[in-house]
C-alpha cells in the first residue's frame, strides 16, 4: 500500500513469495526473494522439485538469479526481480561457476558431497534431527532428487555453456554451534 517504498525483500515460504512478488513486480518495485520461487527458470522443474505448479510462471524468465560475488554491479542494480540462491547452491556455485566458465575444470563427472548441521535440513520437526540421533552420526539425505539439485545444475550449466548433470550428495552432520 505504501507508494514510497522501492525495494521489497521477501523472506516467505516457497509458494507464498510469488503471491507477493507478482503485484510488486507489476507495480514497478524491485523485489529480492529469499524463497525458491524464482530460482529455477523452468516451471516443469519447479513442479518436479517442489511438488506444486508455480504460482506465476510468467515471471520465472524475468528473474535474475544472483550471487553478488559472481554478478556485475549493473546486473544487481538493473534487476527488478532477484532470486537469491539456497544455502547448498551458494556453497557449490560460488567456487565452481568461474572454474567452469573459464574451462579450468572438466564439466563431466562433477560430484558434490556437502554437509550441514541439522538446521540446514529445513524447519520440519523430525526425530532424526534431534541431537541424540545426529550426534556422532552423519547421514546422506534427499538423494537422488534433493530440491537444490535442479538449481545447482541450471546455474553450472550456464557456466559451462552446456547441459550438466552433477551428483549432489547432501549430508546432515553432527555439528555443534
Where do the PLM segments sit?
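N-terminal Rossmann-like NAD(P) cofactor-binding subdomain of oxidoreductases
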Residues: 1-143, 161
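Oxyanion-binding "anion nests"
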Residues: 142-177
Amino acid at each position: 500500500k505504501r507508494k514510497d517504498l522501492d525495494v521489497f525483500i521477501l523472506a516467505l515460504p516457497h509458494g507464498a513469495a510469488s503471491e507477493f512478488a507478482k503485484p510488486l513486480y507489476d507495480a514497478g518495485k524491485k523485489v529480492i526473494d529469499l524463497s525458491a520461487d524464482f530460482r529455477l527458470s523452468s516451471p516443469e522443474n519447479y513442479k518436479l522439485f517442489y511438488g506444486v505448479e508455480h504460482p506465476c510462471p510468467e515471471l520465472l524468465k524475468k528473474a535474475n538469479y544472483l550471487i553478488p560475488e559472481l554478478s556485475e554491479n549493473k546486473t544487481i542494480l538493473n534487476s527488478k526481480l532477484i532470486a537469491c540462491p539456497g544455502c547448498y547452491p551458494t556453497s557449490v556455485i560460488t567456487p565452481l561457476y568461474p572454474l567452469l566458465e573459464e574451462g579450468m575444470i572438466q564439466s563431466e563427472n562433477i560430484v558434490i558431497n556437502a554437509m550441514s548441521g541439522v538446521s540446514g535440513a529445513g524447519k520440519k520437526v523430525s526425530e532424526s534431527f534431534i541431537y541424540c540421533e545426529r550426534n556422532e552420526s552423519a547421514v546422506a539425505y534427499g538423494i537422488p532428487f534433493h530440491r537444490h539439485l535442479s538449481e545447482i545444475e541450471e546455474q553450472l550449466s550456464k557456466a559451462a555453456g552446456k547441459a550438466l548433470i552433477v551428483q549432489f550428495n547432501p549430508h546432515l552432520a553432527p555439528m555443534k554451534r
